[in-house]
Curated annotation (Swiss-Prot):
Organism: Phenylobacterium zucineum (strain HLK1)
Coiled coil: none
UniProt pathway annotation: Amino-acid biosynthesis; L-lysine biosynthesis via DAP pathway; (S)-tetrahydrodipicolinate from L-aspartate: step 3/4
Taxonomic lineage of the native organism: Bacteria, Pseudomonadati, Pseudomonadota, Alphaproteobacteria, Caulobacterales
Organism domain of life: Bacteria
InterPro entries given in the database record: Aldolase_TIM (IPR013785), DapA (IPR005263), DapA-like (IPR002220), Schiff_base-form_aldolases_AS (IPR020625), Schiff_base-form_aldolases_CS (IPR020624)
Subunit architecture: Homotetramer; dimer of dimers.
Classification via SUPFAM superfamilies: Aldolase
Alphabetical UniProt keywords: Amino-acid biosynthesis, Cytoplasm, Diaminopimelate biosynthesis, Lyase, Lysine biosynthesis, Schiff base
Protein name as it appears in the record: 4-hydroxy-tetrahydrodipicolinate synthase
Localization in the cell: Cytoplasm
Catalytic activity: L-aspartate 4-semialdehyde + pyruvate = (2S,4S)-4-hydroxy-2,3,4,5-tetrahydrodipicolinate + H2O + H(+)
Functional summary from the UniProt entry: Catalyzes the condensation of (S)-aspartate-beta-semialdehyde [(S)-ASA] and pyruvate to 4-hydroxy-tetrahydrodipicolinate (HTPA).
PANTHER family per record: 4-HYDROXY-2-OXOGLUTARATE ALDOLASE, MITOCHONDRIAL, DIHYDRODIPICOLINATE SYNTHASE
Family listed: Belongs to the DapA family.
């Protein structure tokens, strides 16, 4: 069996702010905490990193800062999605230029391309930049769902190496494992179902929860990847309430509240994301107690 290019837990990093600006010192500290906690990679400027409200300059700077801070200790998969193919190519090209190990490219949102349009989008990126690409399929946010048939076609392209699957459809993992080739990387994009996803052959998760609990998430994934399902299930039971609580309000507000409570960064977000509600805060704190974080 071939080892996948990426595996384990890769936190979908928040982008901390202070007084409306990216807090670079806090971001560096968060990256160092993740690496010390044993995570297997880093994913800056994705959904949880509020990429939608970063300027292009900020987006590029956060990727550069992540790569510089990681210093090759773990791989960096840079968020580089856009509903404009030309813009996505530019973001992927920048990720390659600054030394990222791969790019995470979300399916084009809002303009709702056909399945053939989705294939053409990723084919164009594949042809333009020599950097490994992970397809990010999250239809609840994009209103498009890339089909297994298109993914099989994409798996034949040299630079499209795998997927972040946030559909919660576990059968997709089995299908892709059987039809996309043994080098195809399969990462869940949904913490609560990652255990089942890995049981179907997935290799890990791009995780929101790891922002708050890197050591615990790393232990969970190490157990699952080694086939110790009993220990992995114990970790699942300990973390599942936190998985849910971090989406008790619009993400990443609950995650930033949790990090603020731990003294790691401000809970500041950018509009239209507002701070977590009092009910969400209470739910997050209860979940953090369950997980042994406070």
């Amino acid at each position: 069996m071939i080892d996948p290019m990426f595996r384990g837990v890769l936190p979908a990093l928040v982008t901390p702010y202070r007084n409306g600006q990216v807090d670079e010192d806090a971001f560096v500290a968060l990256v160092e905490r993740q690496i010390a906690g044993g995570v297997h990679g880093l994913v800056p400027v994705g959904t949880t990193g509020e990429s939608a409200t970063l300027t292009h300059e900020e987006h590029r700077r956060v990727v550069e800062l992540c790569v510089k801070t990681a210093r090759g200790r773990v791989p960096v998969v840079a968020g580089a999605g856009s509903n404009s193919t030309a813009e996505a190519i530019e973001l992927v090209r920048h990720a390659k230029t600054v030394g990222a190990d791969a790019a995470l490219v979300v399916t084009p949102y809002y303009n709702r391309p056909s399945q053939e349009g989705l294939y053409a989008h990723y084919r164009a990126i594949n042809d333009a930049v020599q950097l490994p690409i992970l397809v990010y399929n999250v239809p609840t946010r994009t209103s498009v769902d890339i089909s297994n048939d298109v993914l099989v076609r994409l798996s034949k392209l040299p630079n499209v190496v795998g997927i972040k699957d946030a559909t919660s459809d576990l059968v997709r993992a089995s299908f892709q494992r059987l039809h996309c080739g043994e080098e195809w990387v399969m990462l869940s994009g949904d913490d609560p179902v990652a255990l089942g996803y890995m049981a179907h052959g997935g290799h890990g998760c791009i995780s929101v929860t790891a922002n708050v609990a890197p050591e615990q998430c790393a232990d969970f994934y190490n157990a699952a990847l080694s086939g110790d399902w009993a220990t992995a299930l114990q970790w699942q039971d300990r973390l599942v309430r936190l998985h849910k609580a971090l989406f008790a309000d619009a993400s990443p507000a609950p995650t930033k509240f949790a990090l603020s409570h731990l003294g790691l960064c401000s809970e500041e977000t950018r509009l239209p994301i507002t701070p977590a509600s009092e009910a969400a805060r209470a739910e997050v704190l209860a979940a953090m107690r369950d997980a042994g974080l406070i």
